[in-house]
Amino acid sequence: MASYASEVKKELTSIEVHPEHAKAELAAFLRMNAVLSRHDGQMSLDIVTENPAIARRIFSLIKTAYGFEPQLIVTRKMKLKKNHQYLVRVAQMVSEIMADLEIYSPKKGFITGVPDKIKYSEQRSMSYLRGGFLASGSVNNPETSRYHLEIYCTYANHSQDLQEIMNKYFDLNAKVTARRSGSIVYLKEAEKIGDFLHVVGAVNAMLAFEDLRIMRDMRNSVNRLVNCDTANLRKTAGAAAKQVEDIELIDQKQGLESLPEKLASLARFRLQHPELSLKELAEQVPDGPISKSGVNHRLKKLHEIAENLR
């Protein structure tokens, strides 16, 4: 069964984009996942994934953005022998693509942050975030886990740039923390996670997330109410048991007939109906109905009499 995060990514890989947005998405993919290699004396950019939908996405983005098809190599993992690995290899226009996507320049070397032309464009930022999430993002199932979405980055300045984009344009309240020789930018609020899914284009996943979140919140509310009702019932039952104990002591020591009529009437009624709440006693007592405070006053009198007899 596919994980919730896998379903989100599957939806994202089906989105059709303009060549400029394909470049923005591809810039995130290559910056975060690509390895610069040399094969047969020729430079190449290699991206490895176990997700076939993501491999197809990278293939499609390169074709859309640069007009050629990269190599797609499928291998089987040696240890598990059941999972395939997909290698997307860009073996042409490598220098041009790296320069165009501002991943490398002769003057600056490798560029680890988000390029300005993306960082200062809300539309390109949306595509870049989509690429970043597909490259190294994850999101918990809202039905079974705590709310959490994250994107892992090797470089701290890259995660800080992603945080800036998320908060500046989309008010996502993203935070950054160090993690395993890198850092993550993450979201913890359910509403903000739903907003992020909408921003990157996972509309169906966002709607499913909201449905699951609402159901979970409703279940939590019902559980709180049930727990509250249970606690109130226990409290009522405990108070009633003490009242019955007081009345039985009075009956044993001096008899209920020795009490003033109003106290005796309530005492007999409480013995007959130990399950009733204070409100129900006030409504149903034979000489009533009376107020809850009136019932409470009489019960306190009975308690004082019982304490004097102990």
Swiss-Prot record:
Lineage summary: Bacteria, Bacillati, Bacillota, Bacilli, Lactobacillales
Keywords: Cell cycle, Cell division, DNA-binding
Protein name: Probable cell division protein WhiA
Function noted in UniProt: Involved in cell division and chromosome segregation.
Keyword Chaperone (UniProt): no
Positions of the DNA-binding region: 277-310
InterPro entries tied to this protein: Homing_endonucl, Sporu_reg_WhiA_N_dom, Sporulation_regulator_WhiA, Sporulation_regulator_WhiA_C, WhiA_LAGLIDADG_dom
Family membership noted in the UniProt record: Belongs to the WhiA family.
Pfam family, one: HTH_WhiA
Classification via Gene3D superfamilies: Homing endonucleases (3.10.28.10)
GO biological process per UniProt: cell division; regulation of sporulation
Source organism, top-level taxon: Bacteria
Listed HAMAP family: HTH_type_WhiA
Keyword DNA-binding found: yes
Gene: whiA
Molecular function in Gene Ontology: DNA binding
